[in-house]
């Protein structure tokens, strides 16, 4: 019978700086725990400390560092001379060499945490110091997010974007392997192993960029074809319920999981029941605080769905006590890509998780927000009506004359506009339509072309 490997264990580490209150600090650590769970690890402990900042070489004070090392089985010593923790094989070997009886097996030692996950971005030297002190592998928040993105990327574009971000994260954290600093390889005279590795990364990044540019050109062409269509983009913090709402609005079988970053690729579906003209709904990658800048830059083309949408729906988990800061993170990322000028509506999701008093307080605070549960058909139907009304206000009526020689364009007209009436005369079909001004302009251009 095949046995599954044990679930990796991890300890979380958080620093609470003076500008962060207790609620925000605890929420951030809880979010980090969910990120770690998404990686498939189990959180078995948390070490937290109030400090002025996160820039110190030791990160933690000596007492908290000792507490962390006790959990992981490390020495708690942070110096370049600190010996690495001895493996069980090394302990058995040294015990046999000295003729000593082997130590009694420690039932807890096998389950000591292999990972220390820090809720901040760390410098390479901080990572090395903590690894020496704890004997565990150290990941910072950025490293965890990059790894999750790497595992969840499905499309070619997403995989290319994530690999670029991952290499940019790894490059400054490379260091010489033990005994490797003196080796010289490669075409450059005196090129060390480290320099060679970094050069390989630079070459790979250049190769990835070329491939990504080609993929994105294809994506730009697809988006250009949808430019004058009715488009709604769901944007918001990760795990706010965007994919559940997407499924409810479109009837599509998009992935819905209680995991952070379950969706990395933009999905475009048609609002159901279908309208004329059709309304397209996009589900975009979720945001998170301290989202690595390289990941934001890498996903700029994916987020172009938000930039080019007619309407943004800011989907928020109303049951989360930190929803306001999550909303600000979303708005901040959209400002960064230039999408802050797109018309938007606030959608307070998961209202079914709140008691009547909390719901009333939210109504007072956000009187213009759309309040719903993605799992309540009545709420979803009301949102659909709101979307239709938004686009109706943007549409105009006009008359199109379709020559008999161009009857092949009738499908495009019915797809891009609502046909209110149809007559015939000696020139062709005379169609009274209602559509967005840009769509009517494009259709008239097509009809006038030879």
From Swiss-Prot:
- Region annotation (Disordered) maps to 79-110, 173-196
Which family, according to UniProt? Belongs to the TRAFAC class OBG-HflX-like GTPase superfamily. HflX GTPase family.
Q: Which GO terms describe its molecular function?
A: GTP binding; GTPase activity; metal ion binding; ribosome binding
Per its UniProt record, the required cofactor names are: Mg(2+)
Name the cystine pairs. none
Q: Which UniProt keywords apply?
A: Cytoplasm, GTP-binding, Magnesium, Metal-binding, Nucleotide-binding
Give the protein's recorded name. GTPase HflX
Q: What is its main location?
A: cytoplasm
**Which residues are noted in the entry as GTP-binding?**
236-243, 261-265, 283-286, 349-352, 373-375
**Matching NCBIfam families:** GTP_HflX (TIGR03156)
Q: State if Phosphoprotein is listed as a keyword.
A: no
Q: Where does Mg(2+) bind?
A: 243, 263
Mind telling me which HAMAP family this protein's record contains? Answer: GTPase_HflX
Q: Which organism is it from?
A: Gluconacetobacter diazotrophicus (strain ATCC 49037 / DSM 5601 / CCUG 37298 / CIP 103539 / LMG 7603 / PAl5)
Instruction: Please name the SUPFAM superfamilies in this protein's record.
Output: P-loop containing nucleoside triphosphate hydrolases
In this protein, which residues make up the domain named Hflx-type G? 230-395
Write out the GO cellular component annotations. cytoplasm
Q: Where in the cell is it found?
A: Cytoplasm
Subunit details: Monomer. Associates with the 50S ribosomal subunit.
- Composition bias of kind Gly residues appears in 178-189
Known role: GTPase that associates with the 50S ribosomal subunit and may have a role during protein synthesis or ribosome biogenesis.
């Amino acid at each position: 019978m095949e046995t599954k490997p044990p679930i990796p264990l991890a300890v979380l580490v958080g620093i609470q700086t003076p500008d962060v209150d207790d609620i925000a600090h605890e929420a951030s650590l809880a979010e980090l725990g969910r990120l770690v769970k998404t990686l498939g690890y189990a959180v078995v402990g948390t070490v937290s400390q109030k400090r002025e900042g996160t820039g110190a070489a030791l990160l933690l004070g000596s007492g908290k560092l000792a507490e962390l090392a006790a959990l992981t089985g490390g020495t708690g010593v942070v110096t370049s001379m600190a010996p690495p923790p001895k493996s069980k094989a090394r302990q058995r070997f040294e015990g046999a060499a000295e003729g000593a009886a082997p130590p009694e097996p420690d039932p807890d030692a096998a389950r000591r945490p292999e990972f220390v996950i820090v809720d901040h971005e760390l410098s390479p030297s901080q990572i090395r110091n903590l690894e020496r002190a704890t004997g565990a592998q150290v990941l910072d928040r950025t490293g965890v997010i990059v790894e999750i993105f790497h595992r969840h990327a499905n499309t070619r574009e997403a995989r290319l974007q994530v690999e670029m971000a991952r290499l940019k994260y790894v490059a400054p954290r490379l260091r010489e392997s033990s005994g490797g600093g003196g080796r010289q390889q490669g075409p450059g005279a005196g090129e060390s192993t480290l320099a060679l590795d970094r050069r390989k990364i630079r070459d790979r990044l250049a190769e990835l960029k070329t491939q990504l540019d080609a993929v994105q050109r294809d994506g730009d062409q697809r988006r250009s074809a949808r430019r004058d269509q009715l488009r709604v983009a769901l944007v918001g913090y990760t795990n706010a319920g965007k994919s559940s709402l997407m499924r409810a609005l479109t009837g599509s079988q998009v992935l819905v999981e209680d995991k952070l970053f379950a969706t990395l690729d933009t999905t475009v579906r048609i609002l159901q029941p279908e309208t004329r003209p059709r309304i397209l709904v996009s589900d975009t990658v979720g945001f998170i605080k301290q989202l690595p800048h390289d990941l934001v830059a890498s996903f700029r083309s994916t987020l172009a769905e938000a930039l080019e949408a007619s309407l943004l729906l800011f989907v928020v988990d109303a049951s989360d006590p930190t929803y306001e800061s999550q909303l600000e993170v979303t708005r901040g990322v959209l400002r960064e890509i230039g999408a802050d000028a797109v018309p938007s509506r606030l959608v307070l999701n998961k209202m079914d998780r709140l008691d009547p008093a909390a719901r009333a307080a939210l109504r007072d605070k956000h009187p213009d927000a759309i309040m719903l549960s993605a799992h309540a058909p009545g709420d979803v139907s009301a949102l659909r009506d709101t979307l239709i009304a938004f686009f109706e206000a943007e549409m105009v009526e006009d008359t199109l004359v379709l020559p008999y020689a161009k009857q092949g364009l009738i499908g495009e007209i019915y797809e891009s506009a609502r046909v209110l009436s149809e007559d015939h005369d000696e020139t062709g079909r005379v169609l009274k339509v209602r559509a967005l001004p840009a769509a009517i302009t494009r259709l008239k251009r097509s009809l006038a072309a030879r």
